[in-house]
Amino acid sequence: MFHLTQLVPRQEVTSTPVATATLTLAERRKKLPDFIGKNRRPMTKAFIHSVFDRDHPDTAERHVIEAFAEAVVALDDSVPTGTYVDMCSRLPVVDPEKITVPTLIMRGEHDGIASMDDLLKFFARLATTDKQFTVMPGISHASFQQKNYMMVYHILASFFSQPAPVYRG
């Protein structure tokens, strides 16, 4: 088994440019040394509830949040820290100028993780001209568990079912 610090040298993490800080990311960055020092972080029902409550507490039904929390903690009591290391030190994790395939970026109106400014900058840098950006009203970060979840499915279905361009000039 390897330790996360073997993959992420401390000097590389601290010198990597990061995205604009949302309040949630700014708070999370304070814990970056802990995330680097451990391979896993606890996954609790309280944490799952915080995902839904931190940005805009009324975007999801309480019974949906509770059912989701129960299902997640039934799978495992911890999750890898790698995604937190990446979001605290390496955003964006891919170079948008190398993305040449059709791309859809969806952002919840109340998302406290992915800032509008960061996503729009990323979107503008995409190499593909076949791209769409959409803001989903009344949705925070966990879009599939929100009250407006049908909007998510509609946007995805529309994107994947649209006809290919006849002319590209």
Predicted regions and their residues:
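Alpha/beta-hydrolase
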Residues: 10-94, 98-101
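Alpha/beta-hydrolase-fold serine-hydrolase catalytic core, especially in secreted/extracellular enzymes
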Residues: 21-25, 30, 129, 147, ...
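Short beta-strand/loop motif that positions the catalytic acidic residue
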Residues: 99, 105-107, 111
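Catalytic histidine-centered segment of alpha/beta-hydrolase-like enzymes
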Residues: 133, 139-153
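Conserved alpha/beta-hydrolase "acid-adjacent" motif
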Residues: 112-118
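Hydrophobic "lid"/C-terminal helical patch
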Residues: 156, 160
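Active-site nucleophile loop of the alpha/beta-hydrolase fold
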Residues: 1-9
